[in-house]
């Protein structure tokens, strides 16, 4: 997910403190402060605090670009905002984070999207309203995933097994859910319980995600559903590919009847095992929810396709087959 950091360069602790308090309340991911303010800044709230001197690199020459590539987390500050140096660093930096210091909304949008991938985040300063506007830009731009249409091939009731319910700290809307699957490279958009039902009230914070063995997509990694616990980061995915970050509030693992759903995209097959109940739904290409009780072969649903194999949830270049 894209990050937003506060760049508190003020030599006045009172000014820096006010910006820090605003950034913490708005929900910033981190802050950069003068080294002599570090101890006081860390007492204001739980947020990543980094000394400006350790992270900020001013870019005005090719040599500066080389220095930036050596930092694990680098905040790029351009003497005169230019796209090409940022593109160079984004393209060449293979690990760590690239954060771009920006002054305007236009520069923020450009930094977050350059070379399609964009910087990992932006660093900004200003009053509370300015900080909030930058925050909204970052969350709107956000991450996106490419969802494709898959055709259902098989629907088969199974016996009883353990399934995982993920209760998040976020209220989801119809068309949103999480990417879950038996294969790390083929994941189904499992709908949130954001629709009313004649049987139960809606639970818009919940995704009844699937069997304990299933993978959950979280950024560039995967997690086993059975491993999740309160406080873990998860991703809420919308039918149009928009992604937003959330956190687990509670996980419930219970024994329930299960059903296997198998689907196919251009000859590539994948499957997911869900609870066999009418309130469990997948998401169709138009964003509507489709109950597993009504799903039939030939129906189209949304899935995500990956490319690489994974080792402990991380993408690796190796041969692996999952069925």
Curated annotation (Swiss-Prot):
Q: Does the keyword Amino-acid biosynthesis apply?
A: yes
List, alphabetically, the PANTHER family matched.
3-DEHYDROQUINATE SYNTHASE (PTHR33563:SF1), PTHR33563
Entry GO MF terms: 3-dehydroquinate synthase activity; dehydroquinate synthase activity; NAD binding
The EC number(s) attached to this protein equal 1.4.1.24
Reaction(s) the record says it catalyses? 2-amino-2,3,7-trideoxy-D-lyxo-hept-6-ulosonate + NAD(+) + H2O = 3-dehydroquinate + NH4(+) + NADH + H(+)
Protease recorded as keyword: no
Specify the taxonomic lineage.
Archaea, Methanobacteriati, Methanobacteriota, Archaeoglobi, Archaeoglobales
Name assigned to this protein: 3-dehydroquinate synthase
Q: Which GO terms fall under biological process for this protein?
A: amino acid biosynthetic process; aromatic amino acid family biosynthetic process
Role played: Catalyzes the oxidative deamination and cyclization of 2-amino-3,7-dideoxy-D-threo-hept-6-ulosonic acid (ADH) to yield 3-dehydroquinate (DHQ), which is fed into the canonical shikimic pathway of aromatic amino acid biosynthesis.
Keywords associated with the record? Amino-acid biosynthesis, Aromatic amino acid biosynthesis, NAD, Oxidoreductase
Query: What protein family is recorded?
Result: Belongs to the archaeal-type DHQ synthase family.
Tell me any Pfam family this protein matches: DHQS
